[in-house]
């Protein structure tokens, strides 16, 4: 759909390459420490949207990000339990009434390949 080539609004972006004004950061109380690793950026973006601001993706912004380089992979029982807990907290907070206004309703939610819903 060529979306990666265009500036457009999204519900959330990765914190690995995010810019936000300080006053907005403070208005929504920053990143929630309940999400120490997973979902902290998504939760933050959703709270920014609730406050009336847009989350904008800009394809001209570039950076190298080595996923999990500093914290390692989720390969221990402790890390997997933390991830499971953060997932449960995120879903409890956001999935009850949330519908992503930027996700095409004609696409499936069952995968990550943007295939058509059938």
Show which residues each predicted segment covers:
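C-terminal, non-catalytic tails of nucleotide-sugar-dependent glycosyltransferases
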Residues: 1-10, 14, 19, 55, ...
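A short, conserved alpha-helix in the catalytic core of glycosyltransferases
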Residues: 2-29, 34-64
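Residues at the C-termini of beta-strands that transition into short coil/loop
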Residues: 59, 67, 94
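Short acidic (Asp/Glu) and glycine-rich catalytic loops that position anionic groups and cofactors
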Residues: 64-70
């Amino acid at each position: 759909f060529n979306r990666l080539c265009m500036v457009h609004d999204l519900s959330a972006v990765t914190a690995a390459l995010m810019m936000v004004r300080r006053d907005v950061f403070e208005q929504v109380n920053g990143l929630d420490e309940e999400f120490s690793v997973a979902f902290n950026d998504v939760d933050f973006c959703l709270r920014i949207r609730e406050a009336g601001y847009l989350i904008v993706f800009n394809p001209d912004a570039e950076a190298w990000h080595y996923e999990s380089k500093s914290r390692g992979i989720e390969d221990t029982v402790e890390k997997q339990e933390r991830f499971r807990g953060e997932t449960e907290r995120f879903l409890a907070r956001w999935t009850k009434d949330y519908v992503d206004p930027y996700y095409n309703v004609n696409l499936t939610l069952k995968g990550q390949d943007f295939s058509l819903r059938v």
